[in-house]
């Protein structure tokens, strides 16, 4: 049975989920990348090499790395799992009733590895076999048009689900272009053999309902230990979602405090982890221009039903987090360089590091000023190339979904 649960941001990382660059990224163009919520086209071959290097460096430190294409492929061998995904992805509301009826038999018979590649990489009219209404669709649309859009942001596994102590959320995401990612996570957690028998709760989000204004993404969510959860509320995560997650955690006794961090809404600070991440139990790297503007609200449980009270915090975020963790003061490493360099390095994910254990982080090599400051503070910085992977606006923290992380001492 697989061990799961994330009990801190910097405890020993045991198991993590990633998604390598693949077909979805080969299909990015200057004309479609923004519709697919990817900032730029990437040199896929080089991005694959750099991602493989990232995986190897984690494995060298004893981390078990699970890859989403492989997990999904194994999951889709199960007929019930395949039906679960296709019922929701190959549906009239997604691709039209006639196209869905034509494609469903073809996809039901498809090899699971190929099906997994298409579910992540998308299906264009040109991919369809002859006789599947292909000629009619090709005459009406361009052959490169997608009947099932690719989801290239699967590269950033932090967002569609997040493990919080002994359970997980399957996150209703802010932009429609990313919501298919969550369906894949739901299928893996429900049906993959290594998760099917594991003991864990799904705190929230495992539903086909319309979540309306309740959206959440994992880049905003940090279980920092001792039953405390830090949640950014900026561009992508809303108070409507935070309240529901808090209630579920409090009802189960899984958390004692949820700290909501109200952030300015900006593309450069779309998630909390783009401006603030932990490097050690009491060490954080941050982009002060944004963090200094964050206002905090603490949620505390009132009863066994998960009802809670909300208290506005009058102190700066760093003081609130330090008090919650029981430390006198957080040691901070700000984005390095002068004003121009700091803004560039934050944009290039200089503060988006992932800890493999206390005091050891993975960072992009290009953020030389910030990495130097981290090393001077006693943090071991393992670097990976960021010239291609970073074009999607996410670093090591964004690209990883911890499945099992130990608490800190």
From Swiss-Prot:
UniProt key word Hydrolase: yes
Pfam families (UniProt xref): ADI
UniProt catalytic activity: L-arginine + H2O = L-citrulline + NH4(+)
Entry coiled-coil feature ranges: none
EC id: 3.5.3.6
Domain of life: Bacteria
Record-annotated active site: 398 (amidino-cysteine intermediate)
Chief location: cytoplasm
Pathway: Amino-acid degradation; L-arginine degradation via ADI pathway; carbamoyl phosphate from L-arginine: step 1/2
Compartments where located: Cytoplasm
GO annotation, biological process: arginine catabolic process to ornithine; arginine deiminase pathway
Family, as annotated: Belongs to the arginine deiminase family.
Protein name: Arginine deiminase 1
Organism of provenance: Rhizobium meliloti (strain 1021)
């Amino acid at each position: 049975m697989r061990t799961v649960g994330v009990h801190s941001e910097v405890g020993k990382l045991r198991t993590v989920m990633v998604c390598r660059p693949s077909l979805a990224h080969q299909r990015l163009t200057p004309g479609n990348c923004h519709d697919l919520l990817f900032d730029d086209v990437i040199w896929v071959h080089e991005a694959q090499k750099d991602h493989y290097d990232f995986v190897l460096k984690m494995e060298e430190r004893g981390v078990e790395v699970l890859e989403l294409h492989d997990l999904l492929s194994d999951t889709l061998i199960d007929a019930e799992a395949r039906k679960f995904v296709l019922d929701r992805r190959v549906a009239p509301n997604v691709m039209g009733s006639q196209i869905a009826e034509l494609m469903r038999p073809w996809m039901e018979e498809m090899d699971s590895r190929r099906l997994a590649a298409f579910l992540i990489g998308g299906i264009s009219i040109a991919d369809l076999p002859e006789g599947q209404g292909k000629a009619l669709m090709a005459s009406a649309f361009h052959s490169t048009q997608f009947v099932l859009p690719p989801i290239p942001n699967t590269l950033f596994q932090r967002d569609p689900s997040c493990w919080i102590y002994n359970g997980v959320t399957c996150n209703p995401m802010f932009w429609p272009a990313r919501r298919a990612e969550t369906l894949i996570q739901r299928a893996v957690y429900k049906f993959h053999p290594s998760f099917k028998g594991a003991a864990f709760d799904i705190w929230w989000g495992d539903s086909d309902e319309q979540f309306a204004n309740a959206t959440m993404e994992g880049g905003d969510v940090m279980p920092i230990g001792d039953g405390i959860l830090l949640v950014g509320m900026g561009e992508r995560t809303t108070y409507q979602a935070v309240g529901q997650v808090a209630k579920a955690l409090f009802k189960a006794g899984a958390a004692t405090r949820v700290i909501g961090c109200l952030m300015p809404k900006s593309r450069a600070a779309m998630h909390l982890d783009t401006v603030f991440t932990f490097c050690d139990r009491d060490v954080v790297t941050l982009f002060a221009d944004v963090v200094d503007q964050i206002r905090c609200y603490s949620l505390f449980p009132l009863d066994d039903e998960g009802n809670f009270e909300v208290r506005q915090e009058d102190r700066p975020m760093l003081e609130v987090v330090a008090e919650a963790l029981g430390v006198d003061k957080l040691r901070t490493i700000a984005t390095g360089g002068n004003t121009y360099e700091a803004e560039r390095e934050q944009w290039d994910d200089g503060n988006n590091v992932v800890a493999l254990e206390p005091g050891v982080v993975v960072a992009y090599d290009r953020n030389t000023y910030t990495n130097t400051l981290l090393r001077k503070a006693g943090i071991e910085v393992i670097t990976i190339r960021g010239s291609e992977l970073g074009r999607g606006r996410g670093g090591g923290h964004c690209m990883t979904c911890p499945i099992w992380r130990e608490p800190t001492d």
